[in-house]
Amino acid sequence: MMSNGGDSSEIVRELEELKLKKAEIEHRISTLEAKLQDTAAVELYDAVSNGDSYLTAPELEHGLSPDQIYRYSRQLLLPSFAVEGQSNLLKSSVLVIGAGGLGSPALLYLAACGVGQLGIIDHDVVELNNMHRQIIHTEAFIGHPKVKSAAAACRSINSTIKVDEYVEALRTSNALEILSQYDIIVDATDNPPSRYMISDCCVLLGKPLVSGAALGMEGQLTVYNHNGGPCYRCLFPTPPPTSACQRCSDSGVLGVVPGVIGCLQALETIKLASLVGEPLSERMLLFDALSARMRIVKIRGRSSQCTVCGDNSSFNKQTFKDFDYEDFTQFPLFAGPLNLLPAESRISSKEFKEILQKKEQHVLLDVRPSHHYKIVSLPDSLNIPLANLETRLNELTSALKEKGNGHANTESCTNPSVFVVCRRGNDSQRAVQYLRESGFDSAKDIIGGLEAWAANVNPNFPTY
C-alpha cells in the first residue's frame, strides 16, 4: 500500500513538472510568433519606404478592397455579374418590409451578397411558431423584436454592410420618410392593406417594388413600378373580398414555400441593384409546391386609368397620408380580435369553465375547419365548420334535442344553451350572429376562443 502511495506521488509530481514545461514552451512559441510578425511588418515597412510598391495593396479602378474581392470572389467570377455587378450592389440600398417567412431568406441572401445598406422594418416579436419558416430567427430570440433578431443575423453573416433597424409598424404616417431612403423596396408582408400602401408609396417615390406572396403550398413573385411597368393597383384596382384574403397564421403554410419565394425576391432585388439580368416586370412567377412546378405568366401592363400611377392621377403625398387602407380593403393591418357582438352575447373562457363545473346542459359548437379540429379540441364539442354551418344546422338542432331530452325547440332553442368556440374568437362571433338570426337565441360566443382557454383556464392546452 505504501509503495503504491509513493508511486502515485511520483506520478503527480512528474505530471506537474510536465505541465509547467508545457506552459513555458507555449509561452515561448507565442513570443517567437509575435517577434516574427513584428519582423515581417518592419521588413514590409522598409520595403515600401524604399519604393517597393509591389508589396502594397494595388490601387484598383473598380474600388473593391482586397477583402471585398475575396469575400465576393464567387460572384466576381461570373462573366455576367463580374466587378461591375458587385460594385453596383455595394452602392445600393434595400428596404425589406417584414422579417417573417418571406423576409427571412431575402434578408440573409441580401446581406451575404453585399448590398451596401439594408433596412429592416417589422413591429412583431419572435415566437416559437415562427421557427419552421422564419429561418433568420433562433430560439434564443423568442420574445424579442424580429428586427433585432434579423439585424443580428445579417451582421453575423456580413459585418461590412450597414444594417438599419425599424422596430415599428409601417403606416402612412412614416412610410414616405422611411422608403425614401432606399433604392429598392421588398414587400415581404402578408395582408392587402400593406400591399396597397407599399405599392402606392413606391409609385409616389419612384421606387421599384419586389413583391412576393406565399400561402399554403403556393407562392408568387413579381416586380412592380419598374421601367414603366404596372403598380399593384394597375392589376388590382378593387380589393379582393375579405373571404379571399388570409394570413399564414390562419390558413397555414409549408415552411419551405415562403423560403423559395423569399430567395427569389432576393434574386430579383440583386438583379435590380446590380443592373444585371431581366427583372420580373410585367411578368409574374407562380410556384406550386405540390407539383414542384414554376411558371411565368404575362401580366397586364401599366394602366393609364390607374388612380395612383395613371396619366391623370391626382394621387399625391398628402392623399397617401390621409388614405385609410384598412377601410379600403376591409382588412386589418394587424391580426387582432374582432368585436361584432354585444356583451350579453358573449362569455369569457373562465365563465365557460364554471358552466362545465356546474354541469349545466349545453352544446359546445366548434366552428373551426375540420383539419383544425383534428389538431386539438375541447371534450364533448360538436364540430361544424363555419363555412358549412348553414347547411348543417340540423346537426346542431339534433344535438340540442339530445341534450335537452327532446324538449329543445328549433324556433327558440333557449334551453339548453349553445356556446360557440373557434381558434381566436373571431369566426365564433360570426357564427353566433348567424345562429341568432336563425332563431338560436341562446347562442353565445366564447371570447378569445381556444387561445383564451389555454391562456386563462388550462395552460397545458395546446395552441397553434
UniProtKB/Swiss-Prot annotation:
Question: Which residues does the entry assign to the active site, renumbered to this chain?
Answer: C248 (glycyl thioester intermediate), C422 (cysteine persulfide intermediate)
* Reactions that this protein is recorded to catalyse: [molybdopterin-synthase sulfur-carrier protein]-C-terminal Gly-Gly + ATP + H(+) = [molybdopterin-synthase sulfur-carrier protein]-C-terminal Gly-Gly-AMP + diphosphate; [molybdopterin-synthase sulfur-carrier protein]-C-terminal Gly-Gly-AMP + S-sulfanyl-L-cysteinyl-[cysteine desulfurase] + AH2 = [molybdopterin-synthase sulfur-carrier protein]-C-terminal-Gly-aminoethanethioate + L-cysteinyl-[cysteine desulfurase] + A + AMP + 2 H(+)
Q: What does the record give under GO molecular function? A: ATP binding; metal ion binding; molybdenum cofactor sulfurtransferase activity; molybdopterin-synthase adenylyltransferase activity; molybdopterin-synthase sulfurtransferase activity; ubiquitin-like modifier activating enzyme activity
- Into which EC class is this enzyme placed? transferase
Tell me the ranges covered by the Rhodanese domain, including all copies: 358-462
Which cofactor names does the annotation list? Zn(2+)
**One cellular component (GO) term of this entry:** cytosol
Protein name in UniProt: Adenylyltransferase and sulfurtransferase MOCS3
- The principal localisation class reads cytoplasm
Residue sites binding Zn(2+) per the record: C231, C234, C306, C309
Q: Which keywords belong to this entry? A: ATP-binding, Cytoplasm, Metal-binding, Molybdenum cofactor biosynthesis, Multifunctional enzyme, Nucleotide-binding, Transferase, tRNA processing, Zinc
Q: In which pathway does it act?
A: tRNA modification; 5-methoxycarbonylmethyl-2-thiouridine-tRNA biosynthesis; Cofactor biosynthesis; molybdopterin biosynthesis
Has the keyword tRNA processing been applied to this entry? yes
Subcellular localization: Cytoplasm
Q: What is the lineage of its organism?
A: Eukaryota, Viridiplantae, Streptophyta, Embryophyta, Tracheophyta
Role played: Plays a central role in 2-thiolation of mcm(5)S(2)U at tRNA wobble positions of cytosolic tRNA(Lys), tRNA(Glu) and tRNA(Gln). Also essential during biosynthesis of the molybdenum cofactor. Acts by mediating the C-terminal thiocarboxylation of sulfur carriers URM1 and MOCS2A. Its N-terminus first activates URM1 and MOCS2A as acyl-adenylates (-COAMP), then the persulfide sulfur on the catalytic cysteine is transferred to URM1 and MOCS2A to form thiocarboxylation (-COSH) of their C-terminus.
Known CDD domains for this protein? RHOD_ThiF, ThiF_MoeB_HesA_family
* UniProt record, GO biological process: Mo-molybdopterin cofactor biosynthetic process; tRNA wobble position uridine thiolation
Query: What is this enzyme's EC?
Result: 2.7.7.80, 2.8.1.11
Source organism of the structure: Arabidopsis thaliana
Q: Which family does it belong to?
A: In the N-terminal section; belongs to the HesA/MoeB/ThiF family. UBA4 subfamily.
Q: Does the keyword Transmembrane helix apply?
A: no
Q: Which domain of life is it from?
A: Eukaryota
Name the residues that bind ATP.
G101, D122, N129, N130, M131, H132, R133, K146, D190, N191
In terms of InterPro entries, this protein maps to: MOCS3/Uba4 (IPR028885), Rhodanese-like_dom (IPR001763), Rhodanese-like_dom_sf (IPR036873), ThiF/MoeB/HesA (IPR045886), ThiF_NAD_FAD-bd (IPR000594), Ubiquitin-activating_enz (IPR035985)
